[in-house]
């Protein structure tokens, strides 16, 4: 009897300790690591939700930029962090689904070394064209590209990035062959588009919209499944090419083996942050839609997107 009583007490204390540990999270600041420098859409979104998460969790939530190698450095640092819920990674679709296909020598495995938390938000791209290009819509663009195969060049912010992938998917879907001209970043890519050195590019809303508003570029179409609120009169590519859809998305993940209850607590904090009116307004200005799906849904989505882009990369014979 004494042995059973002692066993009961030990078991009860263990359960209580586990309960207290779960209830005490978080007990110190949480760091959201980004693989890119400040100023981009990813950084803006992270800094919008961080203070809201802090209020919800009762601890500071700090955004830390660790740029380099297209996000690999930041992602690697989180893969090696303690799986305790205090260090998480927030990155782009490229980090989770394109880079792993293009680079087989990554110092981590997205599927094995990370625990998905949530897809934070998503955004369609915009097909921007030079003002001198004699086309008014996607159908005319395709016809012009077929009639002038040697005159059609598209720019991108770099080889293997989403703007490059979007244009290659457009090439394939439209049955055309435009030439890729990669740049070191979005700014020089767009500047040469304005100057007429290239004919078109696929880019984020925030990158090209000011130039559309100033009359330097034209927004021919957007790449999501529905029209953007900031460009309501601009059609989607899918109105001409059925099924065409390219969205950039932003997701959050923790090191593998992070306790499930902490993953779920972080997901809830992100979801609640995205419901705040000021956050929704700021995201809308960027042409970004909040998502906040479950960890399981996000994990499945990463795999689906990886498979999808692997086919695009294979069909276009894209190499790093």
Give the residues covered by each predicted segment.
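Bacterial N-terminal signal peptides that target proteins for export
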Residues: 1-9, 15
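An extracytoplasmic/periplasmic, membrane-proximal ligand-sensing/linker region
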Residues: 27-29, 213, 260-320
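Anionic-ligand binding region
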Residues: 188-245
């Amino acid at each position: 009897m004494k042995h059973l009583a002692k066993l009961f007490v030990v078991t009860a204390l263990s359960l209580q300790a586990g309960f207290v540990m779960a209830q005490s999270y978080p007990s110190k600041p949480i760091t959201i690591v980004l693989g890119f420098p400040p100023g981009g859409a990813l950084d803006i979104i992270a800094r919008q939700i961080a203070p809201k998460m802090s209020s919800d969790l009762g601890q500071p939530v700090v955004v830390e930029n660790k740029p380099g190698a297209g996000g690999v450095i930041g992602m690697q640092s989180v893969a090696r962090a303690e799986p305790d819920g205090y260090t998480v990674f927030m990155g782009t679709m490229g980090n989770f689904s394109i880079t792993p296909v293009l680079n087989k020598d990554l110092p981590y495995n997205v599927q094995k070394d990370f625990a998905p938390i949530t897809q934070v938000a998503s955004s369609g791209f915009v097909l921007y064209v030079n003002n001198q290009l004699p086309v008014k819509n996607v159908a005319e663009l395709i016809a012009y590209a077929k009639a002038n195969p040697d005159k059609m060049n598209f720019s991108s912010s770099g080889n293997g990035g989403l703007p490059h992938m979007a244009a290659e998917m457009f090439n394939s879907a439209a049955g055309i062959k435009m030439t890729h001209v990669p740049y070191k970043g979005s700014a020089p890519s767009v500047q040469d588009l304005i100057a007429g050195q290239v004919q078109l590019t696929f880019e984020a809303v925030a990158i090209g919209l000011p130039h559309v508003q100033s009359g330097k570029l034209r927004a021919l179409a957007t790449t999501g499944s529905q029209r953007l609120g900031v460009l309501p009169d601009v059609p989607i590519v899918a109105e001409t090419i059925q099924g065409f859809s390219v969205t950039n998305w932003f997701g959050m993940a923790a090191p593998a083996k992070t306790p499930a209850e902490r993953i779920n607590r972080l997901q809830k904090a992100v979801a609640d942050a995205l419901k705040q009116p000021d956050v929704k307004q700021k995201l809308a200005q960027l042409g970004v839609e909040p998502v906040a799906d479950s960890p399981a849904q996000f994990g499945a989505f990463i795999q689906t997107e990886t498979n999808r882009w692997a086919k695009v990369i294979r069909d276009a014979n894209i190499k790093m």
